Amino acid sequence: MYVKTAVIFCSRNCIPQIALGFGPSQMSTHVQSFLIKLMLMQHFPDVMLGEEFLSLNLDQVCSLISSDKLTVSSEEKVFEAVISWIHYEKDTRLEHMAKLMEHVRLPLLPRDYLVQTVEEEALIKNNNTCKDFLIEAMKYHLLPMDQRQLIKNPRTKPRTPISLPKVMIVVGGQAPKAIRSVECYDFKEDRWDQIAELPSRRCRAGVVYMLGKVYAVGGFNGSLRVRTVDVYDGVKDQWTSIASMQERRSTLGAAVLNDLLYAVGGFDGSTGLASVETYSYKTNEWFFVAPMNTRRSSVGVGVVDGKLYAVGGYDGASRQCLSTVEEYNPEANEWSYVADMSTRRSGAGVGVLSGQLFAAGGHDGPLVRKSVEVYDPGTNSWKQVSDMNMCRRNAGVCAVNGFLYVVGGDDGSCNLASVEYYNPITDKWTLLPTNMSTGRSYAGVAVIDKPL
């Protein structure tokens, strides 16, 4: 599907515009091939999931994965793509394993992934050249940081992908009742646009970006807490539904860890939840993992260094907002407490910037906060940073281009249409010059590549 989308887009947009400059007679298939390759490189994590990628020939795959401009969040995606491509027609493609692995930058993979995944892969075990590539990667990790330049080849060179312009998607929310409206903010143009509405009203949902799509998970439709999940495709400007969660959840936390979507805590209409479930896009199924130690509704979540954090919230039992924070280790499938925040926060906006966890605003009973604190997993400690310009609870949060954005929310008396962002270098918050068209709290926020 993604390859076809790239071809259609290029044929309708890029190719005709370039042809105006070259002249139709000079417009070659080489230019068309270049444009399509550029699209595939920029959207590789999405492309690698499709049958069209698996049907590419050897030279086409090598051309893609050897490029310094390939857009991937980690080299794991490239390794997984190679394994999938080989398995698609294993009998005829097995002989190409070494040629493909020559372009996978194994030294840039985490050591744990090399040991637990790469070394255990049968296709690697049965190929001497591939085993040599693995040994090279392990040697690279054994060297002190200042000596790693001694192993200098294309596999040790970090990729430098072409960055695509980003837009921010603000999904649903409460204004003052649950709404279907979805707004899109173009950072470059400083402009808000309405995009495809949700299939049904939804506020207090968990919203995340995963593998090229935006997921709206659970929430409240104005009458009931729901377990349904809708997925937004920016290329098509269209929402579709996928498998529902096991439990109804509103005011939940949602995050992505290791290509799995986690739904954390929340409120089912009668009680706060400690349960946690996760969604696999490969099987379109939800399954439970270990529950938290504390029931948490209005909880904020974030992922740092392979761990999932649940921040503050409301437990319903003590009838107090929480300052406690829990950390989930997916390998051990267990939750453990880490350092408490300095203040109780329910409905805090939680986001991750530069490897640190931010908790912005929230409330403690009737007191709505504008204070912000930051957690450093390395020191297991929280510190205060500058206050926001406005008191906010139940706001959406996202990080993009080195800034942390806090979107909407309410100040205790009215829903907010304003957005402000934090600059960690200056320790300063700045209001965006333009507001959303609708003041909304309990909206979800995600950042995606600007649809072409």
Give a label for each model feature.
Residues 1-28, 32, 36-190, 226, ...:
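Alpha-helical scaffold in the C-terminal half of BTB/POZ domains
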Residues 142, 162-176, 196-197, 210-222, ...:
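Glycine-centered tight turns/hairpins at beta-strand boundaries that repeat
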Residues 165, 179, 202, 225-226, ...:
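A detector of repeated loop/turn-to-beta-strand junctions in beta-rich toroidal repeat architectures
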Residues 181, 203-207, 228, 250-254, ...:
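Beta-propeller and closely related beta-sheet repeat lectin domains
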Residues 182-188, 228-236, 274-283, 323-332, ...:
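Beta-propeller blade signature
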Residues 192-195, 239-243, 284-290, 332-340, ...:
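Blade-edge beta-strand/turn elements of extracellular beta-propeller
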Residues 200, 222, 238, 247-248, ...:
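Conserved loop/turn at the beginning of each blade in beta-propeller domains
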Residues 416-452:
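Blade-level signature of beta-propeller repeat domains, shared across WD40, Kelch, NHL, RCC1
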